[in-house]
Amino acid sequence: DLNFKLFGDTLSLTANGFFHRLNPTFYYRHYHSRHAWWDNNSMSKMLHTRLQGILHYQKTRTTLRIGIDEINNYAYFASSYTVNNGNRVNHAITVNQYGGAINLITVALSQDFTLGPLNWESVITYQKSNNKTVLPVPDFNIYSNLYIKFKIARVLSCDFGADVRYFTKYFAPDYNPGLGQYTVQTNTATDGTDS
């Protein structure tokens, strides 16, 4: 951590990172059910490296985070299906492991405002994956949360508000209830809001 004086307050710069060498989790290696069955004992260990820097200015409650990830031997679930008259048919789930390196760049800008009981928190994130078929992410993601914070009878804290999310078009992962996991898919691209 480094701290700098700026306009009567402190600007802090933090750098961190990690290196993980992990076996793919149990369900990537073994799964037995009525509709899917696999035993993958020969999967390679995943290597995940992250370097990130965080610049934070307390006076304006502004944070800038820049991160770079590299993932080797990335394991993931993939689903495929055919849409026939609005129904999904020929649904198949596979476990895949990408043998190359996947690079992910993330730049996130956070800004928080408070005016009496009114609070507004916003985050704008830019992400770029060099392999969107294996690790799909939206290019831009915006999150905003507007709420009022107050106390009832000076003891009960209350937060009342709403949040909104927007992201650019991408192939969002599908949820598979049989596995209880998200799977990569290339059938339906999604974008827009979720509030």
At which residue positions do the language-model features occur?
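Exposed, low-structure sequence patches enriched in small/polar residues
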Residues: 1-195
